[in-house]
Curated annotation (Swiss-Prot):
Binding site for pyridoxal 5'-phosphate: 111-112, 183, 211, 239
UniProt KW Transferase keyword: yes
Protein name in UniProt: 8-amino-7-oxononanoate synthase
GO biological process: biotin biosynthetic process
GO molecular function: 8-amino-7-oxononanoate synthase activity; pyridoxal phosphate binding
Cofactor(s) demanded: pyridoxal 5'-phosphate
Organism the protein comes from: Stenotrophomonas maltophilia (strain R551-3)
Pathway: Cofactor biosynthesis; biotin biosynthesis
Amino acid sequence: MARPDLTARLHAQRALRDAQGRRRTRRTVTRRDGVRLEVDGQWLTGFCSNDYLGLAQQFSVVNALQDAAAREGAGAGASHLVCGHHAMHEALEREVAEWLGYPRALLFGSGFAANLAVQQALLSEENDVCVQDKLNHASLLDATRLAGARLRRYPHLDTEGAMRQLKHAPDGAAMLATDGVFSMDGDIAPLRALSLVARLQQALFYVDDAHGVGVVGDGRGAVAAAGLSVDDVPLQLVTLGKALGGSGALVLGRDDLIEHLAETARPYIYTTAVPPAMAAAALEAVRLARRDHWRRTKLTDLIALFRSEARRHGLDLMASETPIQPLLCGDDHTAVAMSTALEQAGWLVGAIRPPTVPEGKARLRVTLSALHTPEQVRGLVEAIANARDRVTLAVREAAPPPLPAFA
């Protein structure tokens, strides 16, 4: 039997994506000014960034990065366990741990690497299992597979389903993992109920709160907003690249768990540390997120305005009170057509299609920032309603005429 040819396979897969209209392409941003982006020579108002608090270009954050780069250079020079753990890394870990009420934190280059590190280091023996929400982020789901553990999934937000899956896997050590805020739906996991499930089933409860920290509750994220602590959620992940406007991620947890990760997690051990200048920028962003409550207040007001205007225009909202506001379109073609129509009108909103979301659940993913104005929010909603009407009319006109009726 002939060995499969990888090049032929990838060409076949690409042809299939072409046929399905699911090719992914990058857009090059030439310049950025707050929520305004220059793309292909056109200035657009963006509603697709994760810069929820508007800190990515904030003056003191950028200044902290520049000052640290002048002192420390462009890179860390080594992995954390060799000689790459700088004072700025330590200061950032301590600040975030103190803010979120955890004993310790461990800094990673990305949330994807951090999720892999947690599962690879902890789910290390045969029959170990990770039980997850079906709509968890790809990095959580992929981490289980890459760690070699068993993956069992429960229906979205279904705590009884989580309990059943844990009961059906009694032989190995168990982890119950969930997003805090779900990145494509914008809803929040029932963390208090899930923490009880984990406790009853002797599973370690792990929350990826990438989209919650800085935004949910008083800014400490979904775990704190649910009234939970390290005793309930022994490990949680927060990213620096969403509300905090930078890059990287931290895993927070009990002393014994963080020490174990530092000593055994391969994505931590075998990679160069984040540049100290990036840690300096993140540290300043954390301090602003803790201090500038007006950013969250304004963001909350903009979310309420968006939902009110969307309902007034009859748009199909999902149940989200976070900056992630998906508008269901159903089929891929409608989502892409509406995104294209919005861009032609001066708005940048991403069309999200399978496999990122389930089949038949293609959507526009609107994300709001404290940098947006009420006028921009109203303008976007009106533009979405106009795009919906245009696309609906085009589909109707392209449909074949009905067959004649017979008596």
